[in-house]
């Protein structure tokens, strides 16, 4: 949950963050669930960024702004299903906003801007089309979802799904304690995150691995480091170890890997292979951190 000003269309936390174009608010705050906003494939540009409030213009003769999905997603999550099928002009809008953290609208005599800081979440079938590299790089982590091959695991999935459909409330009650346990662990990890010690060797390993896979820019190193720190905090560690880097490397870097038409291995396998070679080189050079090698 987040603390917001009552009536703020952009989920502002303080009066200073409340935009000038919006109706005044009292300054009273309320707690609300962190927003999770769906961006449908057929959404128009006006629906995404916002547009002139036609009803207010016609009934009152006032030129007012009607916020879009980006305003609702501020301080929350923006989810896009089939993100690889998103229209190019919407992709361009998202790239601009993701870069600046601000939504700027200048049209129809309006000049509006507001905060638009959100976590971008997307899903899609890569067989239906590729995602533009510029947008793909804006995703911090990438995970390949596959059907389980283990028979017992598949049976358990079927059993749980059947139980959910038979009695949703009973199913949720059954797992309520486990959910609470995970939630508490995440909250504890948030408090501990700032205390994690990061050795210089960890920074070197991040940089070497990103160079080895041909990652452009520094977003790969930063994402890898942040994710490894989050894992270390979640597990209660005090120092970032090489094993933490190893376990999150594929999520942070697989979608940043340069394509090799002659290599039939999946992107995850290629990241782990490059990581193993990188760490071996690091160890041969006399540097050591943690207990495990990347890819080992």
List PLM regions with ranges:
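Non-catalytic alpha-helical coupling and interface elements of nucleotide-dependent molecular machines
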Residues: 1, 10, 53-54, 75, ...
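C-terminal engagement/docking regions of AAA+ P-loop ATPases
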Residues: 207-219, 230-296
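Alpha-helical scaffold segments in soluble metabolic enzymes
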Residues: 47, 93, 157, 205-208, ...
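Short, surface-exposed helix-loop/turn micro-motifs enriched in polar/charged residues
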Residues: 86, 110-112, 131, 198, ...
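Non-catalytic, well-ordered alpha-helical scaffold segments
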Residues: 92, 133, 137, 200, ...
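Conserved ASCE/P-loop NTPase catalytic core
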Residues: 1-150
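Conserved AAA+ ATPase core "coupling" helix
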Residues: 45-50, 131-190
